[in-house]
């Protein structure tokens, strides 16, 4: 994209925009929740729809002049239904967290009970952490992964549900490298007459492509964000059975949002259309294959992976067994200096602060978008290990940085 007009109007902002484009082009994005959208999605998100207020839903707006807003939203809805096989879809949430809020407001009362995965075990803030709205409005208890295996303790979850009697059980996670057994979680919900919300923010694209089990038709509600593995730009989405449609729509608007961001809805429509193409399934499978290769190479270097590997787009490394004196934050900062951007992350049984934890999380969605295959990801694992093993060695960091420069030149991104 050209920023010539921005530069004429505001050189300082143009400098930041061009700097960010250069940063993305010249570094390897391995934060598991990040990806690179197409130029078409970015064009849609910077369209004249940014000017349009469209409170309400297609055919039922509170303002005039919404015919094209209706067209775009209906395209996004229809394409989402085709991608995920959902009965009802709301594409207006501004984010995945807003989508979760829409479900909570739609079917819960303040003080109702939520059972969700502990944040340090791979859950998400919006699933009921005390710092988040969900933890402040609802009564929340959290289930765990088995610290020995790294897998969700489904039996423990079932027992916890029977004891706590939640109104809703949340599945779907932000740092869990294994396939989620939505059927088993639904069984736990059925046993206590609870709703089941499956938050697939991280795996929307994997589910759409059929390379991960789908919760659609299993869970009562499915939420997600649209900028991770689905590559449809920033935003959220809610899917549900038709019986819940009115409650969910009312909880989004007017319950928790005003006018939708129609330029972002346009980006969703374009991204969903791209995901309906046959090559998207190949992309999703390659993303998983790349993560598996990345994890296997880490293990060759003696690093400890939570759960021993991955079934999806991310790997979670516990540094304590191999590098007990090194924190995830040290590694994150050294890798960023070398041009590899991932994040420090808590791990099951965490003993350090969440701001300086014992693990690192690495994802392959953005690398795969650039064209990386398994061999390239194995080399990236080698580079990461060099920095893990010597995060304060300037020569090592410089050596890795030089190789990253070569790789970003080979696997180009935005012109």
UniProtKB/Swiss-Prot annotation:
<feature type="site" description="Plays an important role in substrate specificity">
    <location>
        <position position="227"/>
    </location>
</feature>
<dbReference type="GO" id="GO:0030170">
    <property type="term" value="F:pyridoxal phosphate binding"/>
</dbReference>
<comment type="pathway">
    <text>One-carbon metabolism; tetrahydrofolate interconversion.</text>
</comment>
<feature type="modified residue" description="N6-(pyridoxal phosphate)lysine">
    <location>
        <position position="228"/>
    </location>
</feature>
<comment type="function">
    <text>Catalyzes the reversible interconversion of serine and glycine with tetrahydrofolate (THF) serving as the one-carbon carrier. Also exhibits THF-independent aldolase activity toward beta-hydroxyamino acids, producing glycine and aldehydes, via a retro-aldol mechanism.</text>
</comment>
<feature type="binding site">
    <location>
        <begin position="353"/>
        <end position="355"/>
    </location>
    <ligand>
        <name>(6S)-5,6,7,8-tetrahydrofolate</name>
    </ligand>
</feature>
<comment type="similarity">
    <text>Belongs to the SHMT family.</text>
</comment>
<dbReference type="InterPro" id="IPR049943">
    <property type="entry name" value="Ser_HO-MeTrfase-like"/>
</dbReference>
<dbReference type="Pfam" id="PF00464">
    <property type="entry name" value="SHMT"/>
</dbReference>
<comment type="pathway">
    <text>Amino-acid biosynthesis; glycine biosynthesis; glycine from L-serine: step 1/1.</text>
</comment>
<dbReference type="InterPro" id="IPR015422">
    <property type="entry name" value="PyrdxlP-dep_Trfase_small"/>
</dbReference>
<keyword id="KW-0963">Cytoplasm</keyword>
<keyword id="KW-0028">Amino-acid biosynthesis</keyword>
<dbReference type="InterPro" id="IPR015421">
    <property type="entry name" value="PyrdxlP-dep_Trfase_major"/>
</dbReference>
<dbReference type="InterPro" id="IPR001085">
    <property type="entry name" value="Ser_HO-MeTrfase"/>
</dbReference>
<feature type="binding site">
    <location>
        <begin position="123"/>
        <end position="125"/>
    </location>
    <ligand>
        <name>(6S)-5,6,7,8-tetrahydrofolate</name>
    </ligand>
</feature>
<feature type="binding site">
    <location>
        <position position="119"/>
    </location>
    <ligand>
        <name>(6S)-5,6,7,8-tetrahydrofolate</name>
    </ligand>
</feature>
<dbReference type="GO" id="GO:0004372">
    <property type="term" value="F:glycine hydroxymethyltransferase activity"/>
</dbReference>
<keyword id="KW-0554">One-carbon metabolism</keyword>
<keyword id="KW-0808">Transferase</keyword>
<dbReference type="GO" id="GO:0019264">
    <property type="term" value="P:glycine biosynthetic process from serine"/>
</dbReference>
<dbReference type="GO" id="GO:0035999">
    <property type="term" value="P:tetrahydrofolate interconversion"/>
</dbReference>
<keyword id="KW-0663">Pyridoxal phosphate</keyword>
<dbReference type="InterPro" id="IPR019798">
    <property type="entry name" value="Ser_HO-MeTrfase_PLP_BS"/>
</dbReference>
<dbReference type="GO" id="GO:0005737">
    <property type="term" value="C:cytoplasm"/>
</dbReference>
<dbReference type="InterPro" id="IPR015424">
    <property type="entry name" value="PyrdxlP-dep_Trfase"/>
</dbReference>
<comment type="subunit">
    <text>Homodimer.</text>
</comment>
<dbReference type="InterPro" id="IPR039429">
    <property type="entry name" value="SHMT-like_dom"/>
</dbReference>
<protein>
    <recommendedName>
        <fullName>Serine hydroxymethyltransferase</fullName>
        <ecNumber>2.1.2.1</ecNumber>
    </recommendedName>
</protein>
């Amino acid at each position: 994209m050209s920023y010539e007009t921005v530069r004429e109007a505001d050189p300082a902002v143009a400098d930041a925009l061009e700097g960010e484009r250069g940063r993305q082009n010249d570094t390897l994005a391995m934060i598991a929740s990040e990806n690179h959208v197409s130029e078409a999605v970015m064009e849609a998100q910077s369209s004249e729809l940014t000017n349009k207020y469209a409170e309400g839903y297609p055919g039922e707006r509170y303002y005039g002049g919404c015919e094209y807003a209706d067209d775009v939203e209906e395209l996004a809805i229809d394409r989402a239904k085709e991608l995920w096989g959902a009965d009802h879809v709301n594409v207006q949430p501004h984010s995945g967290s807003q989508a979760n809020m829409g479900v909570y407001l739609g079917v819960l009362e303040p003080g109702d009970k939520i059972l969700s995965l502990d944040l340090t075990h791979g859950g998400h803030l919006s699933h009921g952490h005390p710092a988040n709205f969900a933890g402040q409005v609802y009564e929340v208890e959290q289930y765990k992964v088995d610290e020995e295996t790294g897998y969700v303790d489904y039996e423990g979850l079932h027992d916890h549900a029977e004891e706590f009697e939640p109104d809703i059980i949340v599945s779907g996670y932000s740092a869990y490298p294994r396939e989620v057994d939505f059927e088993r979680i639904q069984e736990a919900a059925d046993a206590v007459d609870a709703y089941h919300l499956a938050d697939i923010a991280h795996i929307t694209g994997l589910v759409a492509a059929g390379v991960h089990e789908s919760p659609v038709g299993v869970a009562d509600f499915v939420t997600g964000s649209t900028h991770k593995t689905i590559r449809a730009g920033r935003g959220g989405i809610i899917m549900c059975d038709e019986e819940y449609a009115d409650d969910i729509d009312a909880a989004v608007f007017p319950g928790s949002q005003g006018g939708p961001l129609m330029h972002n809805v346009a980006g969703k429509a374009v991204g969903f259309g791209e995901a309906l193409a046959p090559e998207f399934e190949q992309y999703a499978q390659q993303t998983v294959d790349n993560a598996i290769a990345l994890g296997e190479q880490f293990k060759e270097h003696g690093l400890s992976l939570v759960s021993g590997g991955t079934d999806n787009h991310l790997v979670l490394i516990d540094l304590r067994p191999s590098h007990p004196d090194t924190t995830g934050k040290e590694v994150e900062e050294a890798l960023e200096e070398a041009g590899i951007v991932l994040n420090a992350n808590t791990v099951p049984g965490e003993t350090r602060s969440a701001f300086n934890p014992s693990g690192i999380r690495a994802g392959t969605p953005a690398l795969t978008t650039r064209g990386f295959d398994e061999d390239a990801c194995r080399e990236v694992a080698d580079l990461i290990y060099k920095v893990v093993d010597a995060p304060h060695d300037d020569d090592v960091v410089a050596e890795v940085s030089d190789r990253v420069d070569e790789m970003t030149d080979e696997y180009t991104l935005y012109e």
